[in-house]
Amino acid sequence: MRSALLTILLLVAALAVRAAEPAEEVQRMAVRLMGKSLADYIEFRQIEADGDVFELHSDKNKIIISGNSANSMAMGLGHYLRYCCHVNVSWDADEKIAMPKSLPPVDKPLRRRALVEHRFFLNYCTFGYTMVWWQWREWERFIDWMALNGINLPLAITGQESVWYRVWTRLGLTDEEVRSYFTGPAHLPWHRMINLDRWQGPLPMAWLEHQEMLQKNIVERERELGMRPVLPAFAGHVPEALKRLFPEARISRMSSWGGFKDDYRSFFLDPMDSLFARIQTMFMEEQTMLYGTDHVYGIDPFNEVDPPSWEPDFLAEAARTIYSTLTDNDPQALWVQMTWLFYIDQAHWTQPRIKAFLGAVPRGRLLLLDYFAENTEVWRKTDSYYGQPFVWCYLGNFGGNTMLAGNMAETGQRIASALADGGCSISGIGSTLEAMDCNPLMYEYVLDNAWSESLSLKAWVDSWADRRVGKAIGQNREAWQLLVDSVYTRSAALGQAPLTNARPSLKGHGNWTTNPAYHYNNKVLYDAWRKMTQAAQTNKRVTNSMAFDLVNVGRQYLSNHFIVLRDSLTAAYNRRDIEAAAAVGLKMETLLSQLDSLLTVHPYFSLQRWVDKASSFGTDAADSIYYRRNAKTL
C-alpha cells in the first residue's frame, strides 16, 4: 500500500513542477547565455501543438521563437544560435560564448517537430569520468546546453547518497557503517550500479550535504526548462552490514567486478524478499521529499554482474517485483533501464532470458536505452525489445577516452533506419556517453536528428564548421569535411587511448585501456589541422571553440605520430644501433614536450583543472588531500 506521506509528496511535487511560466524560464536562459542587451531582442511565445514543436520567424527587429513547452522553445533558441548566428555554445562552462554584436534576422519562417517523444542524455559513468567535481557553475551551463539541444529526459543521480544515508540510518545502521559502504566520489557511479562497495571510503558527510544541495538546484533548473529528470530508485543494492539487522533477509554477494578484491564486492537483496518493498518505499519517500519527482526512475540491476540466478522464472519475477514496488509507491512510475548488460554479456543474456525479464513489466512502463546502438542495435536482436519502448542511443565514449572517433554517416543512417523500422517501439533518440569527450560534434549531430528527417550530413558539417569560428570560412569547412570523411568513419571502441598515455614499452601498448590503433591516414589529419590553422589566420581571431579544435586535432596528430617514432626506436634497439636510438629518442622527447605545450592552450585538456576542482571540495587540508587522491585514481 502506498503511504499517505508519499501520496501527499507526489501531489506537492506535481504542483511544484507546473508552477513556472515556460516562456519566462527560457528568456532567463537567453539572458544567461547572451546577456540582457541581446536577449531583449528575442521574444518567446508558448503555443498549442500536438507534440513537441518550435517555430522561428522575424518580426521587425525582434526574433520570435515559439514552442509548445520551455524545452521546445529552448531547442528553437539553440537552432537559431547554431544556424542563423553561427554561434557555438559548449557544454564546458569554461568556454566563453562568442555572440555577434547584433542578432541577424531569420531568413524565412521555420517550423520543426520532434520526431520522437524522448531525447535522453547521460550515463551513470558520466557522473564519475566527467561531472563528479562539478559545482553549480558547471551544471548551470550544461543544463542550458541540454535545453538548447532539445534534451528532455536527463539522468539525474547526483545527491542520492544523501537519500540512502537517511534510509540506512532509519533502518538502524550506524553513521560509520553507512559512509564506509559508499565509495569515494569519483567511483560512485560503479557503486550505484551495484559493482563496487567501500573503495576509498568512508565518504565525508560534507560531500553528502553538498551534493544534496547541488541536486536540488539541478532538478529545479531541469524542470524549469521542460525536462523530466530521471531519478534513481532501489535496485536491490544493500550494505553488507544490513545482514546484522535482518539476518533472515535473502542477501547475496554479487560476483566480483573490474579486478577489485573480494573486500569490495557488492551485496544484493532478493526483490522477492519483503524487505525489498519496505526499502523501496522508504527511499522514494525520502527522495521525493528532497527532490520531488517526475515519475521517471532509473533502475539497472545486474549491470556487469551476475544475478543470483539465471533461471528465466527468477529474472521475470525479479523484474515484476521491482516494477510493482515502484508503482505501489508511484502509480505513474516509468522504469528506465540501460541495456548494456544485454550487449556486454550476450553469452548469459540469451533471448529467452531477456524476453522473460522484459515481458514481466507491463508494455509501455519500461523504457529501454539501446546503449551502444551505433555499434550494436540490441532492439534488432530482440524483436524491438519484445514490444517495450526504447531510445536509440549513441555511446561514443568509453572511460573518458580522448581519441578522435565516431561513425558519423553510419550513425545518421542507423537513426533513420530505426525511425523507419522501429514501429511503435522507437520512442526516443539520445546518448549514453560515458564521458564528455573530445568529439562534441557527434552528440550535437545525434540530437539534431531527433528534429529532422532529412538532415544533410554535408550541410550539417558545414554549419558545425561555421559556428566553431563564428562565420563561414572555406578552409575550416574543408578541414571538417576531411575529418568526417576519414576520422569520423568508425565507431569508438573500448580501451582507445593515445600511445603517449601508455606505460613505456618497445612494442604493443601494455594495458587494454591504452589501445592507440587508428584506421585513417595520419597525413589527412595533418592536412585538416593545417587548414584549421589557415582558417584561424584568415579569421584574425581565434574563438574558444576554434582554440579547442586546434588543440584537439593537433594533439591527436602528434599522438599518432608518436607511434611511428616509438617503432623506429624499437627497430634501432633491435639492431643495436645506439646512435640511431638516441636520435629517435630525442625526437620523442621533443614531441612530448610539444604536446604538453599544445595542451596548455585550452583548459579542457588540463589534468591540473581536474585535480584542482577535486581539491576545492575539501573543507580542510586533509579533506583536500583525500579528494585529490580520489581524483587521480579514477
Question: PLM features: residue spans?
Answer:
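Positively charged n-region of N-terminal signal peptides that target proteins for export
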Residues: 1-5
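Hydrophobic h-region of N-terminal signal peptides that target proteins for export
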Residues: 9-18
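Contiguous, structured surface segment used for ligand recognition
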Residues: 20-116
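Acidic/histidine-rich, surface-exposed loop or edge segments in extracytoplasmic proteins
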Residues: 57-60, 123-127, 199, 545-549, ...
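Catalytic-core regions of glycoside hydrolase
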Residues: 88, 92-103, 122-126, 147, ...
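Active-site-adjacent substrate/metal-binding segments within catalytic domains
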Residues: 116-135, 146
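Active-site-adjacent structural elements in folded domains
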Residues: 282-286, 309, 512-516, 532-536, ...
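Ordered core of a single globular domain
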Residues: 543-596
